[in-house]
Regions:
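Extreme N-terminal signal-anchor transmembrane helix of membrane signaling/transducer proteins, especially
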Residues: 1-13
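Juxtamembrane transmembrane-helix termini
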Residues: 13-19
Length: 182
């Protein structure tokens, strides 16, 4: 029985150490993913485009109202798009004007999912986070249809729980979902 207790304690200790290590890797991977997204967004920071935003004024308050929908002028006239609270909370950029500008930029200069994955993998290696990574990108078009791309294509990882999700664009129409497996 003493041998069984010793083995059980050793196994429990290994399990707890691994669980703690995975939690640390997950935090490092989340931070690296967000940094990689910012690196891709920053490549477009100096690009000038015409973007008209109405309804904005110079007055702000400390308690900015979180929008539950936005209005966008399309070829079909003014369209109302609902923004889920979850999407807004996980949006890379919160300020309406900047989200609108970024949404217009991404229409003209889309992010390369392959480049984003390469940058994320590089940051993971720098942080010594092992394992495999995958990015699922979902774009919601003006008619609210979704188009999904996974890089690399690996159905087994997509079925697992995601590590983190970030949204870009005025309507939060660009969804980037990060997956890792150790």
């Amino acid at each position: 029985t003493l041998c069984l207790l010793g083995t059980s304690y050793y196994a429990w200790t290994l399990y707890e150490a691994h669980r703690k290590q995975v939690a640390e890797w997950n935090e490092g991977a989340k931070a690296a993913f967000e940094e990689a997204l910012w690196m891709e967004v920053d490549k477009r920071a100096e690009t000038s485009i015409f973007h008209y935003s109405s309804g904005e004024n110079g007055m702000t308050t400390l308690r900015e109202k979180i929008p539950d929908s936005v209005f966008v002028m399309t070829v079909n006239g003014w369209q109302k798009y609902k923004i889920d609270r979850h999407k807004y909370d996980n949006s890379l950029i919160k300020e309406n004007r900047k989200r609108g500008h970024l949404g217009a930029l991404l229409e003209m200069y889309p992010l390369s999912i392959d480049t984003l994955l390469i940058q994320w993998d590089s940051l993971l290696a720098d942080r010594q986070v092992p394992g495999r990574s995958l990015i699922r990108y979902i774009y919601t078009d003006w008619e609210l249809r979704d188009d999904t791309i996974c890089v690399p294509v690996d159905e087994r990882m997509v079925r697992s729980d995601s590590l983190t999700t970030r949204y870009l664009g005025f309507r939060c129409e660009h969804e980037f979902v990060a997956y890792t497996s150790y």
